[in-house]
């Protein structure tokens, strides 16, 4: 039964209350959904509530398989930078060494979302659970297109458009991968959101790097704020110069035209665009630390760059795009 007493009592929900509330509100009238989203917007969202909502949405997914040692790397979007889709590129690069379950969608806030790039390279989104397991076993990689495996977001789309405000759904995406990976690298559009994500990761017993900078990923030229979650939360600042040995001008990795942006990524994998390659490797590196492949981000970055320079990364891109 749907209970929205928290609205009238002006209080925060517990994690279990939030989970039950989300499950029950899915099929409520749009007027009720609007009241729910507006109340959260005015009140503010706590880590308990965000954790409960994300658990509910994962339960509502059409995927019911459990696979250990998966990693996702994802950004919130919303920085309006039109950078190349570095999290998607990094996920493909990382599949050379770890199992990746990339969760994403077509572009909403930017002109080119992760699914737009995957479609560009020829990836087939519709998969059975057997296909998902097969791809992970054979290629270390699967891309989970959010609307295909979870219809919940679509049920709120009309209300969100009419409200015209940032709702909890703007930040739920990175937390709702139906394969429930235990390791996550999340780029957040501001430090407050990054801190909230870190608290949620701790509550859900996950290992994570949460980053925020001038963009929703590790910046190649400015310091990034990092929350490292592994049984506790540790915050530190990351200077890209100390990792890459050079600063990359952000203008070299920003492109509004989707096709040109996608080709920057492909050139990076071919080792023809060193600035973009460095940017991708920088953002891939934390995932290798989470998985125990590297002891620190610098050595992880070196591994990622070597995988690009050796040609292995481009071969993996071709294999994932079903060209093999």
Swiss-Prot record:
Gene Ontology annotations for the cellular component aspect, listed alphabetically: cytosol
Cofactor note: Binds 2 magnesium ions per monomer.
Binding residues annotated for Mg(2+) 1, in chain numbering: 87, 217
A GO molecular function held by the record: anthranilate phosphoribosyltransferase activity
InterPro entries: Anthranilate_Pribosyl_Tfrase (IPR005940), Glycosyl_Trfase_fam3 (IPR000312), Glycosyl_Trfase_fam3_N_dom (IPR017459), Glycosyl_Trfase_fam3_N_dom_sf (IPR036320), Nuc_phospho_transferase (IPR035902)
Associated pathway: Amino-acid biosynthesis; L-tryptophan biosynthesis; L-tryptophan from chorismate: step 2/5
Residues the record lists as binding 5-phospho-alpha-D-ribose 1-diphosphate: 75, 78-79, 83, 85-88, 102-110, 114
Residues annotated as binding Mg(2+) 2: 216-217
Entry superkingdom: Archaea
GO terms (BP aspect): L-tryptophan biosynthetic process
Disulfide cysteine pairs (residue numbers): none
Function: Catalyzes the transfer of the phosphoribosyl group of 5-phosphorylribose-1-pyrophosphate (PRPP) to anthranilate to yield N-(5'-phosphoribosyl)-anthranilate (PRA).
Subunit structure: Homodimer.
Protein name per Swiss-Prot or TrEMBL: Anthranilate phosphoribosyltransferase
UniProt source species: Picrophilus torridus (strain ATCC 700027 / DSM 9790 / JCM 10055 / NBRC 100828 / KAW 2/3)
Classification of source organism: Archaea, Methanobacteriati, Thermoplasmatota, Thermoplasmata, Thermoplasmatales
Gene symbol of the encoding locus: trpD
